[in-house]
UniProtKB/Swiss-Prot annotation:
Species annotation: Pongo abelii
GO BP, sorted A to Z: Arp2/3 complex-mediated actin nucleation; positive regulation of double-strand break repair via homologous recombination; positive regulation of lamellipodium assembly; positive regulation of transcription by RNA polymerase II
Record-linked CDD domains: ASKHA_NBD_Arp2
UniProt binding sites for ATP: 160-162, 214-218, 305-310
Protein name: Actin-related protein 2
Amino acid sequence: MDSQGRKVVVCDNGTGFVKCGYAGSNFPEHIFPALVGRPIIRSTTKVGNIEIKDLMVGDEASELRSMLEVNYPMENGIVRNWDDMKHLWDYTFGPEKLNIDTRNCKILLTEPPMNPTKNREKIVEVMFETYQFSGVYVAIQAVLTLYAQGLLTGVVVDSGDGVTHICPVYEDFSLPHLTRRLDIAGRDITRYLIKLLLLRGYAFNHSADFETVRMIKEKLCYVGYNIEQEQKLALETTVLVESYTLPDGRIIKVGGERFEAPEALFQPHLINVEGVGVAELLFNTIQAADIDTRSEFYKHIVLSGGSTMYPGLPSRLERELKQLYLERVLKGDVEKLSKFKIRIEDPPRRKHMVFLGGAVLADIMKDKDNFWMTRQEYQEKGVRVLEKLGVTVR
């Protein structure tokens, strides 16, 4: 609460999950899938203890997804369907989750770097006009990650469900000219895993079984340190084969797919995406920075988001960065490599890092009026109120 007794809400709207709670807390109150579903056919009114409604959101929609036509309002960090997004926010602020009177609350929202200004304008408009929050702030996700890690300078590799971005932050300022975005993230890896399992002969439906395959991915996938060696193991032995029991009782065996699916992060061509993978993108980003700041960046690489949770990802990233540095900067001089200092921070709670940073920031700033865009300012200026955050509104 701020000094006037208003609740300060923090809402990290991800492409795949909404993480919401209050300023100052060290864990989200609620984490639920960012999906909206509508029944394909209305035959039953109840499944178990869940009543089937014309519109199902979040946890309930996820449980009954096989009977629903499911939509994700966000794709690659950008809101694609505003009506569904509002349903998601109604659910977040309503009795099912936070149960707040939005008129007496302030809210801190998050967004990926390089998001279109139009997206941010619309968010602010909805927050003030539909929900009438007393104060709103929109923060860049990468900066919040560093706050949660107690840093002001570093490079954040944030990979969630919809988008991966590499965002250098120097002395508390994100550097948009150096920020790189890769539209490969958790959802694409799940899709690729479905494709690989179909090739193995298992029958999966792209939409109905999506969540099931996502769970297989989270339980069994990892990033290979040495890809040739992993492929050899997959072909010649059964060391990598693991069994997984599906919700309907079927048992499937997953082998080489365990490392092949996340490999798309490092080799985008596997899923027909042009461009370099996450390791080379990170290297290019740091090398494009001012020469005086590079060593600071190499020493403070922070992983964030659910798609950085694969076992083996930090060590593979480090290996590829060293290799690229050796080839392109040291021109193959192995002797000098010992002077190259690199540190990848992989905090155990990195899945919720953005929320944690938001909760810290909102708590520090809860009584600072010049930090928040207020409802009164919005009534006077409209979306131009965003200029307070340093956004140019044309």
